Design a protein with these regions (language model features):
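An anion-binding loop in the catalytic cleft
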Residues: 76, 81-180
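Donor/substrate-binding cores of folate-linked one-carbon enzymes
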Residues: 1-68, 75
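Short, flexible, solvent-exposed loop/turn segments with mixed acidic/basic and small polar residues
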Residues: 67-70, 141-143
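Charged/polar, solvent-exposed surface patches and flexible loops
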Residues: 34, 46, 70, 90, ...
């Protein structure tokens, strides 16, 4: 989190103070937003008195280290299962709670809220990415470009968000079904 001086550019002002906020493997877009808001508020309260008494020396930003983040859109959430299991799991976490990651199941949008990279997934028989390779009582396993992703929490179009074990009470996807 950075507290900076405003100038005419977009996020180009001098840096006043910064604080590193760790991102865990369980963080979602929503939980990270909350963490950053909390850290930013605390940092601002620490910075204002120092700014007022002149004990802060502004630091010019190094433009070579800057990056641009494009706006989030719903289309960004469409899962391409040909990617790596790790990248897809991170996409799902990053887009939780908006715009959310999704695929298609039986012609309907299926939002995926929680997943994890399946253990020993490289031992699974390779299928076309997006193919359901296994269904258990509480999980659906989907082939990705380099392994298998275990779906844990989903939401079918027009329904509420639920654990996969609850989804499976009303739906019986079969191994071999292709999502997308």
């Amino acid at each position: 989190v950075t507290i900076m001086q405003m100038n005419e550019g977009l996020d180009t002002g001098d840096i006043l103070t910064q604080k590193i906020v760790p991102i865990t493997a369980e963080d979602t877009g929503e939980s990270l937003f909350d963490k950053l808001c909390e850290a930013g508020g605390q940092l601002l309260l620490e910075t204002l008195p120092k700014l007022e008494n002149g004990s802060i020396t502004p630091v010019k930003q190094d433009e070579s280290k800057s990056s641009y983040a494009k706006m989030l859109t719903k289309e960004l959430g469409h899962i391409d299962f040909s990617g790596s299991a790790v990248e897809i799991e991170r996409l799902i976490r990053g887009l939780n709670s908006w715009p959310s990651a999704y695929t298609k199941y039986e012609g309907k949008t299926l939002k995926i809220w929680k997943s994890r990279v399946a253990e020993n997934s490289e031992k699974e028989q390779q299928q076309k990415p997006g193919t359901i390779v296994r269904v258990t009582d509480d999980s659906i396993y989907v082939q990705t470009g380099d392994g298998v992703l275990e779906l844990l929490e989903v939401q079918l179009e027009g329904k509420k968000r639920m654990q996969v074990k609850d989804f499976l009470l009303g739906h019986r996807p079969q191994a071999g079904t292709v999502l997308g």
